[in-house]
C-alpha cells in the first residue's frame, strides 16, 4: 500500500510543483 502511494505521490509531485510555481508568478 505504502509503495503504491509513494509512486502516485511522486507522479503528482511534479504537477503540484509546476502549479505552485505558476501561482507565484
UniProtKB/Swiss-Prot annotation:
The modification Glutamine amide is found at residue 25. Antimicrobial peptide with potent activity against a range of clinically relevant Gram-positive and Gram-negative aerobes and against the anaerobe Clostridioides difficile (P.aeruginosa (DSM 50071); MIC=12.5 ug/mL, E.coli (DSM 787); MIC=6.25 ug/mL, K.pneumoniae (ATCC BAA 1705); MIC=6.25 ug/mL, A.baumannii (DSM 30008); MIC=6.25 ug/mL, S.aureus (ATCC 43300); MIC=6.25 ug/mL, S.epidermidis (DSM 28319); MIC=6.25 ug/mL, E.faecalis (MF 06036); MIC=6.25 ug/mL, E.faecium (NCTC 12201); MIC=6.25 ug/mL, C.difficile (DSM 27147); MIC=3.13 ug/mL, C.difficile (ATCC BAA 1382); MIC=3.13 ug/mL). It comes from the Eukaryota. It comes from Tityus trinitatis. Coiled coil: none annotated. GO terms for biological process: defense response to bacterium; killing of cells of another organism. Belongs to the non-disulfide-bridged peptide (NDBP) superfamily. Medium-length antimicrobial peptide (group 3) family. Keywords: Amidation, Antibiotic, Antimicrobial, Cytolysis, Hemolysis, Membrane, Secreted, Target cell membrane, Target membrane. GO terms for cellular component: extracellular region; membrane; other organism cell membrane. This is Peptide TtAP-1. Expressed by the venom gland. It is found in: Secreted; Target cell membrane.
Amino acid at each position: 500500500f505504502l509503495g503504491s502511494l509513494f509512486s502516485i505521490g511522486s507522479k503528482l509531485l511534479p504537477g503540484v510543483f509546476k502549479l505552485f510555481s505558476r501561482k507565484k508568478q
